[in-house]
Amino acid sequence: MDILADGEYRINDEIDIGGDGISNFIFGRGWLLEIIELSKGDFFFYSDDKEVRSTTTRFGVFYPPFTIVRPHVRNVKGRVIGFGAVRSVPELPQTPFIFDTDLDGILVNVDHVVRILAASPDRRSIVLNSKLSFLSIKAKRLIDENYLAYPSISRIAARLGVSPEHLSRQFKRDYYMSPSSYLHQLRVSEATFRLAIGEEIIDISNEVGYNDLSRFYKQFKKRTKTSPAECRTMLKKPA
């Protein structure tokens, strides 16, 4: 990952994911466009429990802020280029999708991304669930707005007029994870970006709401299967 100015970054890396698995992918603040070219394996998304695939081995994936998607990967090898930023860009779409593309070469800047997406008429939605309950939508919005302050799930439930148990059941039914799990994954996503831009681990722990450094390490390793220091090293490897 190459860190640019104004919270922008560029990706140019190999993909090598062994095995066969499905899991939720959480993208926090900011947005990202990836162009993926597969040389081996299978990579698609689930939307409303249906498979959404590219028709070619080269395709784009767009993630707007605070996205939850559900990819399925099977022994994938290939390459990914990408461009993302933390700052809001009004011209960009508000929902995640994939699209076929013949784009080759790096993504230059925000304007380049806007032009590419505007010229992608074959968009296929990868929204996890298009029939979310109003309760889950409101709960997710509250978490998205307050995740760095460590919002209490019990307090969110009370604010929404339901029990924590009812909120957790409905949220998990809609998003395939509990609200607590979503909160922690969102914070780890934020921590990963901060590691990439060179912030100190102890500062990151505090900034994403973990006042206890050991708890931060535990949650980070649980979600990423690696430590913050190891993750920083991987992010800084040359493409």
Where are these regions (language model features)?
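Generic protein-terminus/edge-of-domain signal
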Residues: 1-55
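A short hydrophobic beta-strand segment most commonly corresponding to one strand
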Residues: 34, 60-63, 75-91
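Conserved metal-binding segment of the jelly-roll/cupin
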Residues: 55-68
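Short, Lys/Arg-enriched, Trp-marked, Pro/Gly-tolerant hinge/linker segments that flank
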Residues: 97-163, 169-185
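Terminal helix-turn-helix DNA-binding modules in bacterial transcription factors
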Residues: 141, 145, 154, 173-217, ...
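Proline-centered helix-kink/hinge sites
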Residues: 179, 227-228
